[in-house]
A protein has these predicted regions:
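Adenosine-nucleotide cofactor-binding segment
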Residues: 148, 164-224, 272-276
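A glycine-/small-residue-rich N-terminal strand-loop-strand element
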Residues: 69-93
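C-terminal hydrophobic helical "lid"/dimerization subdomain
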Residues: 2-4, 273-325
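Hydrophobic/small residue at the entry helix of a nucleotide-binding pocket
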Residues: 155
Length: 325
């Protein structure tokens, strides 16, 4: 390598998207267990908009980004999992809004040649979230009846496709006709509006209820989500897009049929390289087999990170938003 500096996008103050500005920084040197990666695609996520806006405190100046894919260009002295030239993806790097980034070898996986850079950059966070929900939190088997809220969203769209590949009957909720078309295209069996979804599911199941509900919406849906479960069904609350769920009396679960409730997070389901490799490996297999098709809605050059944040915050996306350095 001959480069000694790299272009990054960083913030020196928090605020509106225009605080994201390009800056030249020294090219980082990998530590003993790190690899240096030439960035090919960066996944943009809402947490970065919260960091930029000052909702979540970060040390300034700050280069955002954790999710990316690229080519290994240098390795640390103790690296054994990667070599120069390998294709890599991760959800656990730092400072990925840059032409190059560092990541520990334990927090990244090899990317098959058959997977595009865009898919590799779009997959890790939303893909592993969908995978741990349906494979580990409640393992879905053929014949299970499942509700996943927000079927036109990133996690919802991936989950629907994986659930159908497993032989589940999939119910989902959406907020508009346009989003209903997206969820239907993903393969959902029953696409419902949020208003009255519980009564509709009871009718569609003749009152029998569902095996599991995956709820990333939170405050606006959770209480009704509990009512659509069968006896000993499970509610998996994995997010709060509409706000956090208020505390409730656990005795309520008894009255609704001895229900189970859990509040998982991806960090606890991707704790080591073996687990990350298993999840990402199955996701890559699903792409290669045609069971999973990712939707990249919009791509932006690295220098247009501010525009990308504006686009994401408008909440009109129909898939993943990427930076392509």
């Amino acid at each position: 390598m001959t480069d000694t500096t790299m272009t990054t996008v960083h913030l020196e103050a928090t605020g509106a998207p225009d605080v994201l500005v390009a800056a030249q920084l020294p090219l980082p040197t990998p530590g003993s267990t790190q690899v240096l990666v030439k960035t090919r695609a960066v996944g943009i996520n809402f947490i970065e908009t919260y960091q930029r806006a000052g909702v979540y405190s970060v040390p300034l100046p700050f280069v955002p980004g954790t999710e990316a894919a690229g080519e290994v260009v240098a390795v640390g002295s103790d690296v054994t999992h990667f070599s120069v030239g390998d294709r890599l993806a991760t959800a656990n790097a730092t400072a990925t809004y840059a032409e190059y980034f560092l990541v520990d070898q334990e927090l990244a996986v090899q990317v098959p040649e058959s997977i595009s850079w865009e898919d590799a950059g779009a997959l890790p966070l939303q893909g592993m979230t969908a995978h741990y929900l349906i494979s580990s939190t409640f393992r879905v088997e053929p014949g299970h009846k499942v509700l996943i809220h927000a079927g036109a969203g990133g996690v919802g769209g991936i989950a629907i496709q994986l659930l159908k590949a497993r032989g589940a009957t999939v119910f989902t909720t959406v907020s508009s006709d346009e989003k209903a078309k997206i969820a239907t295209a993903h393969g959902a069996d029953h696409v419902l509006r949020y208003e009255g979804f519980a009564e509709n599911i009871k009718d569609l199941t003749d009152g029998a209820g569902l095996d599991v509900v995956y709820d990333g919406v939170g405050k606006d849906t959770f209480e009704q989500s509990l009512t659509v479960l069968k006896t000993r069904g499970m509610a998996v609350l994995f997010g709060g897009a509409s706000g956090q769920v208020a505390p409730f009396d656990l005795q309520k679960l008894n009255g609704l049929g001895s229900l189970y409730v859990t509040r998982p997070t991806l960090a606890h389901y991707s704790q080591d390289r073996q687990e990350i490799s298993w999840r990402m490996g199955e996701l890559f297999d699903a792409i290669e087999s045609g069971d999973l098709n990712l939707t990249v809605d919009q791509t932006f050059p690295l220098a247009q990170a501010a525009e990308a944040h504006t686009y994401l915050e408008a909440r009109k996306t129909r898939g993943k938003v990427l930076l392509l350095p």
